[in-house]
Amino acid sequence: MSAQSVEEDSILIIPTPDEEEKILRVKLEEDPDGEEGSSIPWNHLPDPEIFRQRFRQFGYQDSPGPREAVSQLRELCRLWLRPETHTKEQILELVVLEQFVAILPKELQTWVRDHHPENGEEAVTVLEDLESELDDPGQPVSLRRRKREVLVEDMVSQEEAQGLPSSELDAVENQLKWASWELHSLRHCDDDGRTENGALAPKQELPSAVESHEVPGTLNMGVPQIFKYGETCFPKGRFERKRNPSRKKQHICDECGKHFSQGSALILHQRIHSGEKPYGCVECGKAFSRSSILVQHQRVHTGEKPYKCLECGKAFSQNSGLINHQRIHTGEKPYECVQCGKSYSQSSNLFRHQRRHNAEKLLNVVKV
C-alpha cells in the first residue's frame, strides 16, 4: 500500500466508551482470507508523518466526548513519536523538527519534507545546502542564474510529486522564485532601486514572477515603481510573462498510479514509498537522499570551512553561516516586524520578537 493511500484512508479510531483499551488500528487492504482490520507491528507501520498529521488535524468533533478525545490524541501521538523504539532525545528532536518545519515558508516546507530529515540538524543542512546552491560567489552569474532556475523547477516538481493540483503550480512557482531570489541576493540599494555604488539593479536579473499568486497569462506592469523584497530592491518596469503550455504527464508511479510531467519529479516522489537514501557517509554510516547533502554533512568530520569572511578572516562550513556573520560588519537588518517596524539581522530573532506580540494579543483577549 502506498503512503498516499494510507494517508487518505488508513486510520480507523474505535472510540467506544466501555472499551478498556482505546487503540488506533490501521486499515489494511483485504488479505486473501478476507480479513480487513488488524493491528500491525511497529516495523510495518506507515510513515510516522501520517500519524503526526492526524494528531495535529484531530478535531474535538471527531470523538463522542472529552475522555475519548484525549485517548485518541494520546494514541495518535504514540504512533507518531513511537516511544517504544525512540529515546527521549529522539522524541525531543522530532518535536523540535516539527515546529521548525512549521515556521518555514510554505515553499521551503515542501523542500525540507521531501528530504525526510530525521532531526533539526538535518533540516538545517537541507536549507543551507539550498542556499549554497543559490548563492555561490565563485560561479559566473549566468551559471548561478541557471542553478536558480533548475532548483525552482525541482521544487515545483516536488509539489507535483506530493499531488498538488496542476492549477496551483504556477502560484507555487511564483513563491519559489521569490524565495530563491531572496536567498540569492545580497545587494543593497536606495529608494531609486540603485545599488550602493549608484548603479541600477540589472534589469535582466529580475525574477519573472511578481507580487501576487494570481498571475494572468500575460502580465503588464505600468509606471515604474520600487519593489522591496527581503534583502533586495529593484525598480519595477513594464514586462510580460507568458505561461508555459501545459505539460503532458507521461511518467507514472507504479506504486500509486500518480502521473508526472518530469522524470525527476517521479524519482523524488518514489522516495516517499521507498525511503531511499543512497548516499552514505563512510565515516559514520549516516545516509542521505542527495549527494549534495552528504557533502555538507562530511564537513562535520573533516572540519572543512571553505567560506571565509574577507573583513575579519573568520571561516564557516556553510555559506549561510558566512552570510549571517557578514551582517555584523554591514549592520544589515533585513528582517522587519510588520507590526512595529523593528528590524533584525537574523530571522530567528524576528520570530522570537513576534512571539512577544502574539503573547500581548493573547493577554488582551484574556482581559476582555
UniProtKB/Swiss-Prot annotation:
Modified residues (Phosphoserine): S132, S142, S274, S292
InterPro entries per the UniProt record, alphabetical: SCAN_dom, SCAN_sf, Znf_C2H2_sf, Znf_C2H2_type
Domain SCAN box: 52-134
Major site of localization recorded for this protein: nucleus
Function: Transcription factor required for myelination of differentiated oligodendrocytes. Required for the conversion of oligodendrocytes from the premyelinating to the myelinating state. In the developing central nervous system (CNS), involved in the maintenance in the progenitor stage by promoting the cell cycle. Specifically binds to the 5'-TCAT-3' DNA sequence. Has transcription repressor activity in vitro.
Protein name, UniProt field: Zinc finger protein 24
Chain spans, region Necessary and sufficient for nuclear localization: 251-301
Description of post-translational modifications: Sumoylated.
Sites of the Glycyl lysine isopeptide (Lys-Gly) (interchain with G-Cter in SUMO2) crosslink: K22, K27, K147, K177, K236, K277, K286, K361, K367
Organism: Pongo abelii (Sumatran orangutan)
SUPFAM superfamilies: beta-beta-alpha zinc fingers, Retrovirus capsid dimerization domain-like
GO cellular component: nucleoplasm; nucleus
